[in-house]
Amino acid sequence: MTNTFFPENERRLLSIHAHPDDEASKGASTIAAYHDEGVYCALVCCTGGEEGDILNPAMDRPEIIDNLPQVRLAELQKSADIIGYDEVIMLGYRDSGMPDSPANSNPDAFANADPEEAIGRIVSIIRRIRPHVIISYPDER
């Protein structure tokens, strides 16, 4: 299979994170440096971050809490733009929360995703982008 979307000489990097805000707290300076060198940087975000804590008291308001997925997505898009991501791909799973939390029982939670289906989606992204470098995490189970 040949890559018809990217020029052959374009260097490409793919970063895979679980939640919005991980792109900012884990490796943002690395992505920014590569982007500044002309590397195409793509981000896969697996969940919407629905179970994330609100650490900023100014954001701990009903209108934020009630719309947390939309707020997290807007934050992610702005953050990705500032860092230098050229593309953001949302896998669309619901945040699973912390281990043994009630959110883990939600059938749409990433923790309940069919591994073959989730892996297949990531593989198709890898095949499309054909990154030279993939940044992700070890299995934390």
Language model segments and positions:
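Short, Asp-centered acidic motifs that coordinate Mg2+ and/or phosphate
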Residues: 133
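Active-site rim/loop-helix segments in enzyme catalytic domains that contact anionic ligands
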Residues: 1-129
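Gly/Ser/Thr-rich loops at beta-strand to alpha-helix junctions
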Residues: 22, 140-141
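Short, well-ordered beta-to-alpha junction loops that form the rim of enzyme active sites
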Residues: 91-94, 136-140
